[in-house]
A protein has these predicted regions:
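Alpha-helix-loop-beta-strand connector modules within alpha/beta enzyme cores
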Residues: 62-87, 144-155
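Structural motif
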Residues: 52, 88, 118-120
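N-terminal beta1-alpha1-beta2 module of alpha/beta enzyme domains
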Residues: 1-79
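Flexible, glycine-rich active-site loops centered on histidine and acidic residues
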Residues: 7-29, 92-162
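Alpha-helix termination/capping residues and helix-transition junctions
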Residues: 43, 82, 109-112
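Hydrophobic residues within beta-strands of alpha/beta enzymes
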Residues: 49, 85, 115-117
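A general structural signal for well-ordered secondary-structure junctions
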Residues: 47, 82-83, 161
Length: 162
């Protein structure tokens, strides 16, 4: 009889996307709260922490803080040692694939190999428009996602990518 795999538990780190910091006016205090959740999750034995790849709040933009996911994970990686780090889920429309390959590989190195990379085609049109990113039709976004995954995987594993 083989044992069932143990459940894996993760927790979201507050970063403002869902207005988790409403009522906390100081961004430095908001950051301390985010880091405290990550450190506490590791101390409690969670397997992973997760952040959203968004730039402003939902359901519509507000003036509340939202911490950018890659910067957030890089900083938290230096305050933790074992917990895995992931995005739920990275948006392909926000960063060119070659840059994304560099960001992800850098974070994986500085975190000691703890990155769990997730990427999607993008869905939040208001956010894309608000930051000046094109928002193609779904078929085109899916094709762009496929190409991006191929580029990132090649840049991670091949001596040269063309």
């Amino acid at each position: 009889v083989t044992a069932e795999p143990a459940p894996i538990f993760g927790v979201f780190v507050p970063q403002g996307w869902k207005l988790e910091f409403a009522g906390v006016p100081d961004p430095r205090e908001q950051w301390r709260l985010a880091v405290d959740v990550a450190v506490r999750a590791e101390t409690l034995g969670f397997d992973s922490i997760w952040v959203y790849d968004h730039f402003h709040n939902v359901p519509k933009p507000s003036h509340e803080s939202v911490f950018e996911c890659w910067t957030t994970m890089a900083a938290i990686s230096q305050r933790t040692t074992t917990i895995r780090l992931g995005q739920m889920v990275g948006c392909n429309l926000y960063r060119p694939p070659a840059l994304l390959a560099k960001i992800t590989s850098t974070l994986d190195v500085i975190s000691g190999g703890r990155l769990d990379w997730g990427i999607g085609a993008g869905w939040y049109e208001n956010e894309c428009r608000g930051y000046g990113y094109p928002f193609p039709v779904p078929k085109e976004r899916i094709a762009m996602l496929q190409e991006a995954v191929e580029i990132v995987l090649s840049m991670w594993s091949q001596p040269e990518t063309t």
